[in-house]
Amino acid sequence: MKEIKADSYSIWIGETSLSKLDITNYSMVAILVDENTKRECLSLLPKINNSIIIEVPSGEEKKNISTCNTIWEKLSINNFDRNSVLINLGGGVIGDMGGFCAASYKRGIDFIQIPTTLLAMVDASIGGKIGINFNGLKNQIGLFSNPKSVIINPIFLKTLSRNQLQSGFAEVIKHSLITNKKHWEILSNTSFKDLDWQHIIDISIQIKNTIVKADPLEKNNRKKLNFGHTYGHAIESYYLEEKKPILHGESVLMGIILECELSLLSQNEKTEIKNYLIKNFQLPDIPSKNKLMKFLINDKKNKEAKINFTLLNGIGNCTIDNLFTEDEL
């Protein structure tokens, strides 16, 4: 088992990491799950006496204020006080929404992240960003609040489909493209079935944690992590509006393809990245820019009435705050 020190909490990684689930000093414990993690993952946790289970429906379209009301109501009717803790057992939706509910319930109770998807392990559970979607726009309501701890156990990867693994792998690819050319070369030249997942999780978390610790509130270099996410969030919001939700990682991969075209890459580098993604991932159709524009102009990262991108200036390097008007895209 490995410990990575984040800003104010520890990230535990390994097959024995669940032994670090410490709830001894809390008055009450709730475990937030969806129908999938209740079925596949809940039994893998150590037994917690006198805990309650809060089950919510799965899916990005359920990451909204209505589901939060359900969570808050369960906490309230069970008389949870400020010395209680919420354990978020699930993917990015559970972690984002559960963290938001905990941080706002009675002005804040502790929460522990136990991510069960690759995407949540390498990205969503790290860094203290929590929130929900609003008015059809991705992550419009939220705040920064760190968990008490993050517990990452590769055993949960066995519960995932190949599509879910590939969705999480999108964030791994992003981390390599923005910071580490050597890591990108290893990933892009290794067969998916031959990947060492624990090693990949370890490296990816270290990349994100280093960036976040230096800029926890995303005032400067943390914006590097937004590569692929301006177009990516617009694509994800578009498919949600069409009632054809896609995985977050799928939208990020399509965002990477589009944002590479805006980046200061050589043509060979653009072709290398695009060909790798198209060859190795079965992606939905990329919507036209006209269909994405209303989502782009409402992106929370925008500045000066312009659309804000993080872009590559080479594989392993990126620049932040690249501003474009609608006409320039």
Spans of features found by a protein language model:
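A glycine/threonine-rich phosphate-anchoring loop and its flanking beta-alpha core
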Residues: 8, 12, 100, 104-192
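Glycine-rich beta-strand-to-loop/alpha-helix junction loops that act as flexible
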Residues: 58-59, 89-91, 227-228
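Residue-level signal for inorganic ion chemistry
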Residues: 14, 31, 115, 153, ...
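Non-catalytic interfacial helical region
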Residues: 70-89, 98-113
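C-terminal charged capping/lid subdomain of soluble metabolic enzymes
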Residues: 170-172, 269-329
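ATP/NTP phosphate-donor binding region
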Residues: 1-85
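Active-site segments that bind and position negatively charged phosphate/pyrophosphate groups
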Residues: 186-290
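Short glycine/serine/threonine-rich phosphate/pyrophosphate-binding segments
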Residues: 93-100, 233-234
